[in-house]
Amino acid sequence: EICACLVGSEMCIRDSKEALAAVGSVGPIINSLIGFFMGLSTGAGVIISQYYGAKADEKVSRTVSTTLVMTFFLSIVFTILGIFITPYMLRMMSTPNDVIRESATYLKIYFGGVAGLMFYNMGSGVLRAVGDSRHPLYFLIFSAVVNTVLDLLFVVSFGMEIEGVALATVIAQCLSAVLTLYVLTTTDGPYRICWKKLCMDWSL
């Protein structure tokens, strides 16, 4: 994510100072989101790792299912809420008037694809909880590379400016989420996702 921001900032420098300021002004909001989602995934991972270590396969499966369902509903809430309150958040942060429009554009696109960030963090949290830290790292590197390539394509080649920077980030995050969910769907472990059986287990 840091790499993505750096690349995006570099692309904005090529465009205008206003675009660079817009990316910088939304940094605290995005960092807070990432920290919040990482906290949720860590909490879920602690529970899953305890059940996994105790060989309680049924509880592992139920916890993973609950985590995915919770992520789905939270992603809807954050997407809708984020898009609508973006202008208010920027005003509360005293964002300069000359960059508030571009900052709002970036944030609205980012919130539109925030599900990718959430599912990647939750999925990677599950994988790390069962001892697989390799796949999340690979997918994170892959996401950073894709983000860099798309930044160059959208901003430099297509001249999409701030929209291109935001769209590149969203696409890269969604791809990493898809890869993470694919691993969880195809594994033979008790943490495998069975899409037809997903449900919330309120007893956990």
Regions of interest found by a model, annotated:
Residues L20-I80, L117-P136:
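Small-residue-rich hydrophobic transmembrane alpha-helices
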Residues E1-G8, C12-I13:
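Single conserved hydrophobic/aromatic residue that forms the stacking wall/gate
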Residues S9, G43, S203-L204:
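Core transmembrane alpha-helical segments of multi-pass membrane transporters/permeases
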Residues E10, G45-V46, T86-P87, S124, ...:
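Interfacial helix-capping/hinge residues at the ends of transmembrane alpha-helices
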Residues E1, I48-A115, S157-L204:
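Short alpha-helical transmembrane segments in multi-pass integral membrane proteins
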Residues E10-N31, N97-E102, I162-E163:
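Interfacial/gating helices of multi-pass transporter permease domains
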Residues T71, V126-L152, L167-V170:
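Alpha-helical transmembrane segments of multi-pass membrane transporters/permeases
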Residues S32-G35, N147-L152, A177-L181:
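Hydrophobic transmembrane alpha-helices of multi-pass small-molecule transporters
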